Design a protein with these regions (language model features):
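Structured catalytic-domain cores with a bias toward divalent-metal coordination
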Residues: 1-339
Length: 339
């Protein structure tokens, strides 16, 4: 079977004006663009790894329109990912793997998508990228923030150009930024909810700033310039349990503003949900080693699900499809800055 990947040296006709839902017809599938610039080492940008997260694509379109009649400051390679899911406005289609879980290092079984991501990494390895930025949206109430997979001064400097809020994580495996961390400083940038012009503008300005960098500093980031957090667990809801928000008649009825807890340091005893007729903890929390650690972070008390210890959530969402396809969210703790 042939590769899913298309490559193009240049900007396909109509790309800069196309809507995300039009890209499957316009491009024919996932596409890697290579554009020349004054500095040869390319900035790599990935977009639409989730088909309903459109800010990355819109930021790239705006950026390239800005440079339509002038030379890019640096070469640029752009990966446009799950265009089939984008046609339907979905994170991924039924039967598709998650495009941000199948990069080298993944736990997922072999698939055409997994082979494609390995191909993208190998192509870019030969081009020696300057830096890598994967642009995402999320569905809950979150600030704009940057994620890194290595505690490294260059990674942190690049991330701090986007936000003072930085998150270090090594799970889930198979994400784009972790695969590219072996090649160059690599980030995931989270730009808030889809459809917010501030997120698109922030992403475009950041990508433009990256194109103008001649080098990335390798000295320590000043402690007063960043807040660094560490993802300590991914939280899932087992399929055996029904769930809802507010006053739903379900097994787990979360508070209706659960997503407003994101990036807030919650004290022990914070109530998250009412539990109906369940004795065991109804959440799974998986730590960096892959161990189930829900009892470390949660307890049931008077039919209420509460935090056992101080913790900070991120990406808690009210979107039931996202929760089933991915997770409820993440738990974080503060992380010391390296010397």
């Amino acid at each position: 079977m042939g590769s899913l990947l298309r490559q193009c040296d240049g900007i396909p006709d109509g790309l800069l004006e196309a809507r995300p839902e039009d890209l499957a017809d316009l491009l024919g599938g996932p596409t890697l663009l290579h554009l020349p610039g004054r500095r040869e080492q390319p900035l790599f940008v990935s977009s639409l790894l989730h088909g309903n997260e459109t800010t990355g694509l819109l930021a790239v379109q705006d950026l390239l329109l800005q440079y339509r009649s002038k030379e890019l400051p640096r070469a640029l390679s752009v990966f446009i990912g799950n265009v089939e899911a984008a046609r339907d406005g979905l994170r991924r289609l039924a039967g598709q793997p998650d495009y941000n879980r199948v990069w080298p290092g993944t736990d997922y079984a072999d698939s055409p998508e997994k082979r494609m991501m390995a191909e993208v990494v190998e192509i870019m390895r030969q081009r020696q990228p300057f830096a890598s930025v994967d642009v995402h949206n999320n569905t809950g109430i979150n600030p704009h923030y940057a994620c890194i997979n290595r505690i490294d001064h260059q990674f942190m400097h690049l991330a701090s150009m986007f936000s003072r809020t930085l998150v270090y994580f090594i799970r889930p495996a198979g994400v784009q930024s972790m695969a590219f961390a072996a090649l160059c400083p690599a980030l995931t940038v989270e730009c808030g909810k889809v459809g917010q012009s501030a997120g698109e503008e922030h992403a475009r300005e950041f990508l433009d700033a990256c194109l103008h960098l001649s080098k990335i500093p390798d000295h320590p980031v000043a402690a007063h310039d960043v807040d660094l957090f560490h993802t300590v667990a991914i939280v899932h809801i087992p399929r055996a349990y029904s769930f809802g928000f507010g006053d739903s008649p379900v097994d787990i009825c979360f508070i209706d503003d659960l997503d407003h807890l994101n990036f807030r340091e919650l004290p022990p005893g914070t109530t998250l949900a009412h539990i109906d007729g369940i004795d065991d903890l109804p959440l799974e929390a998986i730590d960096e080693q892959g161990d189930e650690v829900s009892a470390r972070y949660f307890l049931i008390e008077d039919s209420m699900l509460r935090t056992r210890r101080a913790v900070m959530p991120s990406m808690f969402t009210l979107d039931e499809r996202v929760i089933r396809q991915d997770c409820l969210g993440y738990l974080m703790e503060r992380y010391p800055l390296p010397d």
